[in-house]
């Protein structure tokens, strides 16, 4: 069946055989057979796999074997239906990338700040170092999506306010606070940009974007920011493979929760429409609760 039509490797065929045998054993224990099993039996089997500790990816592989099997039975006229059609695939648990420590983020920011203060060989190079420092300070201060960050309007920096208004997914606006460090970096960047652009256009800044570029969008791109961030990480002595703008957004949320922020507040800052999206960070809350119990419970130390 599978080998004839798909040229499957020997190991793959052996895996499918074991998966089908395991399901056949479950079906037999529940009063049916491999050939006669219905949708309810297959759904119950997935529940049994969960109870036995199988990961969602392993369950999905076994369901795939069953789908192939019943698809061929139906196509060959050996069954009048395919009982797997109504079975939902197991959902994989949302996972977070490795959370950067506060120390790693601090090292990254200090490296960017030092490079911004040193400047570059040309005014344009100096502006690029200011831009990268500002991007990092604003990202870690606000937790913006990278698409929101690179498309900030110039007006966000000119108001010099403690809050900036961000247009997020679906055009929904939210106000997020800026840290003093982010405001300082932003002012220094805008001043350097004014000096560079003003010399070319009689004091006027030509772009409405805070981080302009010559590309089609008119503003700095996510890809360019990610590239510059990885290069900075290498110069700071960090593993570039662990760094991305999205990882810094995760660090923002995780560090807030580690320091006692409410999950609902973090939801609002991140711009999540549904609290369930923010709940992927509950592992941070679990760790904080465990530390609190160990620190304050009278028997936590085993005495």
Feature roles, as predicted:
Residues 1-303:
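Conserved catalytic core of the tyrosine transesterase superfamily
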